[in-house]
Amino acid sequence: MKKYFHLSFFLLTIISFSCGSDKGPGINKDNLQKYLHVPSPSWQDQILYFIVTDRFMDGDSTNNDQGAGEYKKGDGAYWNGGDLKGITQKINYIQELGVTGVWITPPVANQWRNPQHTGTGNHGYWASRLDQVDKHLGDLGDYKMLSATLHSKGMYLIQDVVVNHFGDFYTYDGPYDPEDVSKNFKLHDVEQPMQYPFNHNDAREEEDRELGIYHFAPNFTDHSDTIQKTQFQFADLDDLNTSNPLVRDALRENFGYWITEVGVDGFRFDTPHMVEHDFWHSFLHKKEGEHLGIDLLAKQQGKQHFLTAGEVAFFPKPFDHSGTKEARKYLGTKNKPEMNSILNFPLNTAINRVFIEKKPTSTLSFRIKSIQENFQRSDQLLNFIDNHDAPRLLAKSDRQTMRQALLFIMTIPGVPVIYYGTEQELTGMRQTMFKGGTGSPDRDYFDTESDYFKFVQSLVKLRKTNEVFRRGQLKVVRDNSYGPGLFVYEMRLDDVSALILINTSEKLQLVDGLSVPTFNPGNYVSKYSIGAQNEILSVSHDRIIDMILEAKSAQVYVNTDHSQTKFDLHGTIGLNNDFSEILTTSAIQLSGKAMGVENMGLVIDGDYEHLLPITNRNQNSWFHDLSLSNLMNGKHRITAIGYDDKGSLITSSKYFTLALSTKHLFHFEDEIQDDYGPNGEYTYPSHRSFSHQQDIKAVDVSLTGNNLTLEITMSEITQIWIPPNGFDHVLLNIYIDMPDKQEGVKSLPFQNAFFPNQGEWDYRFALGGFGIEAFEGYPLISGPEKLGKSIMTPFVNVDYEQNKISVTLPAKMLGNPTTLKKTNLYINTWSGSAAYPRTIDKTRTTWSYGGGNSNSPKIMDDINIITLE
C-alpha cells in the first residue's frame, strides 16, 4: 500500500509540474492523513514561495487578538492577523503563479510582546514553546490541513526553524560577571517558558545553572567574535546552550514532531552561523539520546531528501572568496555532514551590487565562479532577490531592475525563492497581502490578472518547461569590468544550450565577436525578453554574434528553437594590431581597413552609447586618435564597427591593458576627535558599539588620468556587524562640484544642511557598510528630501591596519570630464543610509543621536572643501 501511494504521488507531481493545472482533491478530516507524508522531490526542480504568515492572509479573524495588547492591524510592529488558514485558502492563487513549494516563517508558539518594548513576536522568531502552533496562527489541525492541501496539489511545505535562541525572557541589568552569572541577572516580569527543559532559565537558581540549558550571558556586539556569536545573546534573545546533549535531544524531539505530525518536507534554519558546527552534525545526522537526528527521522518517514537549508548570512567582499568559503562550511564534510543547502547570501550580495548598486557585472561573474568552486551541488542552493530582513529590491530600485534580477535567478542552477508579494510589486518589507494590514490600507493583493503577476508567472513557466535552466551547467561568456553593462551567460544541458544576454546599463551595449558554437548559423527569435525591441539573434556562418543590446534589457535564446533564414555579410572591417599590448600613455592612434561598410565608429568596453565616430577615412583605410584619460587602468576591449549595405553589423576587436601612472595631488589633515557635530555638542547613540567611527583624520587625493581616488583615514574602523563593504557605524558622504556643470544642488539631501560656501554639488556618493549609493544632482529632482538620479556606484577598499577607506571614482561616474581641475570635494559623516539617516534629538537613545533636534544638521564630522588644482 505504501509503495502504491508513493508511486501515485510521484505521478501526481509530474503532472502538476508539467502543466500546473491540477487542483487536487478536496481535503477533509477523513482523507487528510493520506496526504500528510509524501516523498521528497528533486529540489533543483522546485520553486519556493516564502511567506511571512502574519502578513499573507487572514483566514480566521477570531484568533487575531489574544488580549495581550499585541494585535494592531495596520501597524507593522504588531500582529496583523495572517494565519495558516489564510495560506490554505490562497493555495490556488499560489499554485496559479506556478511555484511548487511554500516556505513559512516559524509557526511555533511565540512570545507575543517583547518585555523591553521593542516589538512583538509576529514574525515567529521569538519562541516560547516548540511543540505548539502559536494561537495567532491557528492550531495543529490548521497546520495539518495546510500540509495535506499542498501535498494533494503536488506542492511541498518548508518550515522555518530557530535552534539558536528563545524569546526575551531575561536580561542583565548591570555589568556582567562571567564568574558569577547570577549577578545582575533579571527575569522579565512576563509569562515564562513552561516547556521542559526550556523552563530552566533562571541564572539565580543553582539547578538551572547546573542544567545549563541556556548560555547565561549578555548581548554580543561583535559578530566577528566566534565565542560571543555562539554563546552570547543576540538582540537580547535568550541563547540556548546547543552544546548541551540535553538541549540537542530536546530540539531533535520538538522539531522532529513537525515532521511526524505535519509532514513538513524541509527546514530552513534561522541564524545557523550563531550555532557551533558540531551541533548541526549531531542535530541532523545522529541519534544521541532518545531521539533520531532530523535527517534520519525524515528518511524513516519516507523523505529521502529532506531539505535542510541554513540562513548562513555571510556577505562576501567583492572579488573575495572568503565569504563563500565560510558559507560552504555549513554543509560539513563527507565524513561529518551538516546541512544540505544554504540560502545563497553570497550570490544575493552580488545581485545587489550588480543590479541595484550598478557595479561592474564582473562582480557577479566572480561570485558565480566562487560558488561553483566551493559548492559541489550549486543547484541545491536557495537563490533569492528579496527576504523579510531587508528592504525589497523594488523599494531600492525600479521595475526593470527587478525583472532582470528575477530572470537571472530563474535561469541559473539552484532553487529560486520568490518572496511573497513580489508578484504584486509590494514595496513594504513585511507588508500585508490583505486589506487593512500594514502597508495595504485600501486593498488586497491577490490579483492574478495584474501585469506583474503574469510576468512572474511567465518566468516560472519558462524555468519549468526548459530543463536546461534547472539542470544545466552555467558558464559566463561576457561581462564588464568597469561598470554596469553586459552580462552574458550560457546554460548547457547535453545538446541543449540557452544563451542569456542581460544589459544592466541604462545605455546601449555592444555584443561583438561572441562565439556561440552550440548555435547553428541563422536567425533565432527570443524565447523570452525584457525591454527589447529587436528580439532576433543573428548567428553568422562562423557562429559569431554581433548585436546591440538595448538599455536595461534581457533576452533568452535556446539553440533548439528553429533558426530562420541564414544571412551573409557584405563588407569587412579590420583593426590593425600596431599598438602595444600594454599602454602607458593617455592617447593612441588607431588604424585599420574597411570595405563595403558605412557609419563606422569605435566602441570601448561595449559602451555603444558613447560610440566614437570614425571620420578620418582614406579609400579603404581609416584612422582615429583615441584619448585614454577617462579609462581605468586594466584590460580593455576596443571594437571597430560598421554596417554593410543590408544594415548588418560588422565588427573587429582587440584587447589592450592600460597602465597609466598615478599622481598624488593633495593631503588634508582634520582635527582628531572633533566628531561632535557642527556645534560641538552632539553625542553618539548610546549603544555600546558606537565609539569614534565617524571621526575623519585625513584625506588624500590622487588622479590616474581623470579617475579620482580618495583615501580617507578614520580614527577607527570597525566591522562589528560583519558588513559586506568592510566597515560599519558610519555613512561617508562625498559631494563633488564639477566646474563644467552649470546647474548644481545647494541642499544636502536628508542632512538638514547645505553645500559649504554657498556652493552646489553635482554628484553624491553615500558609502555605507551595508550599501553604497550614488546620485547625480539636478535642481528639479534633488533637494532637502530628494536624492537625485541614481547612477553607478564605486568600489570601496578598507585597510584596517592604517584605518583607511579608499574609494576610486572613475571618470565615467563623473560624466567623462575633459579635466578635473577646479573640482571641489566635500566630505562629511553620519550613519544610516542616504535616504534614512539616523535621527537626532535633545537626548540620545540606543540608536539616535543626542545634542540637537529633528532640524539639526545630520553631520557628525566634516572636512573643509578641497579644490583640485
Predicted segments with their positions:
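Carbohydrate-interacting/catalytic domains
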Residues: 19-50, 65-68, 73, 80, ...
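Short, compositionally biased P/S/T/A/G/V-rich stretches that sit at domain boundaries
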Residues: 561-587, 659-686, 691-698
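Short, well-ordered beta-strand segments enriched in hydrophobic/aromatic residues
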Residues: 497-504, 706-716, 805-811
